[in-house]
Amino acid sequence: MTERLLVIGGDAAGMSAASRAKRRRPSLDVVAFERGEHTSFAACGIPYVLGGDIASTEELVARSPAEHAEHGIDVKMRTEAIELDTAGARVKVRELDTGTERWEAYDRLMVGTGASPLRPPIDGIDAPNVHGVQHLDAVPPLLEEAERSSGTNVVLIGAGYIGVELAEAFAKRGANVTMLEAGDQAILRLPADLAEDLRAGIENIGVQLKTNESVQAIGSDHVSTSEGAYPADLVVLGLGVRPNTSLAEDAGMKLGPAGGIVTDDRQQTSIEGVYAAGDCCVARHRISGELAYVPLGTTANRQGRVAGTNLGGGDARFPGILGTAVLKLCGVEIGMTGLNLAEALDAGFDAVANTITSSTTAGYYPTSEQVRVTMVAERGTGRLLGCFIVGGAGSAKRIDTAATALWNEMTAEALAEVDLSYAPPFSPVWDPISIA
C-alpha cells in the first residue's frame, strides 16, 4: 500500500524534505500545503529586489508548483493547515480562496511552517504604511513604495541583519533613511569595535543610525521614540522573526528557545512520526552545546534534507549549527560564526578575544581595503569559539575558513598553521584569519 507524506509549508525546509523523501522513495505519495502564492523561494534575496539589483521576485523562485509536480510532488497552493490530529494521523486544511475545510490523512508528517516578522504591540504598527519583510507575497506593495521612495522619508525599525540590508536597498533608491535600534549598536552580536566600523559604513551612505531608542508609536507621517520623533512616509520592520509554531504547540510538540520546535538529530519532534525543520525549529549549537534559535536559510535547507532522508527511509543526522552568516552594506562586508565573547562566557568557557586590523589584499595592491577580525578562543586550550569580521570587499567569505576551524574544534595555533592561499589581489602573505 502506498504511504502518504504530508508536508506543511512550501518553502526551503518543507520542499527540501519533500524532494529528498520523494527521491529516496519514489513510491511515496507526497502532498505539500502552502498558504502563500509561491514555493521554494529565496527570501534572502528580497532586499536586493527592493534595491533594484534583481529585476523581479520571480527570479527568487527556485522551483514552481508545476516544476514540483513534474517531480511527483503535489503542492496545494493557498491551502493552510489549521489543526493537527497526531493521534488520528490527520491534518485539517483550509482552502483560502473558498473557505472550504477538510481533513487529510497521512502516514508521515513534515512540519516546515517557517517564521513571521516580529510585530511588537506598538501603537500604529498595523497602519497601511508599515511593512514586514519575510515572504514573497508581501513584496509587491513594498516594491511599489521602494520604486517611488526617492526623496521620501523611510524609517527602518531594527538594525539587525534585515535592517542593514534594507538600509542599503532604500539608500540606493534615493530615500532619506533612518534606522532605529533599541540596543547600543547595529548587529548586536558584533564586538563593539567592529560595530563602530559598521556604523561608519552605514553613515557613509547617508543613513542615520539612532541607537538606544525604543519605538513608542507609529503615526501617519512620523515615528515616535523614547528620544524624539522622525518623519516617516514609509516604515519597514526589521526586528527579526518568530517561529510559526502555534500548530505544533496545540498538537503537544515540545518547544524550546524562542518557542521553536525541539527535534532530535534526525529532525523528529517529540511526537513519533512527525518531523520538523527550518525557521520553525531550534537547533543544537556545536560550540555551546545548547539549543538555540538561529533562523537561517542554510540551516533550513540542511535540516530539510536530513528530515527528507529519514522520511524517505534513510538514516541521516543533523550535526548542529554555528550560526555562520554573512551580509553587506554597500562597501562594508560582515561575517560571523560561533560565539562572541559574552556568549562564550555565558556558556561557561574561560574565554578571551583578540582583534586585529589587516588588509583584504596585499597592502600595495590598488583594491586593498581594511579588514578587522575578532577571534574568540578558550584560554588555556586555545580552542576557537567564534570569529567576527568587518571590512571592505573580499572580507566576509573569509568567515568560512574560521567556520571550518570551529566545526572541527581547532585551536587558534592550528588555524594559524593552515596552508592558506596567497596572491596579491586576494590577500596579504599572512591572511587576516591567520593573524587573528
Q: Residues of each region from the PLM?
A:
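FAD-site-proximal beta/loop scaffold in flavoenzymes
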Residues: 126-150, 221-224, 229-306, 401, ...
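Beta1-alpha1 glycine-rich phosphate/pyrophosphate-binding loop at the start
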Residues: 2-74, 167-190, 404, 422
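A conserved FAD-binding loop/helix module that cradles the flavin
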Residues: 263, 277-340, 427-435
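Flexible, glycine-rich terminal cap/loop adjacent to redox cofactors
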Residues: 8-12, 20-27, 35, 329-337, ...
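A Rossmann-like FAD-binding core segment of flavoenzymes
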Residues: 27-29, 69-97, 104, 172-263
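Short hydrophobic core segments
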Residues: 8, 104-114, 230-240, 304, ...
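Glycine-rich dinucleotide-binding loop and its adjacent helix/turn
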Residues: 111-173, 208, 263-265
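Rossmann-like dinucleotide-binding cores of NAD(P)H-dependent redox enzymes
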Residues: 60-61, 153-155, 161-216, 296-299, ...
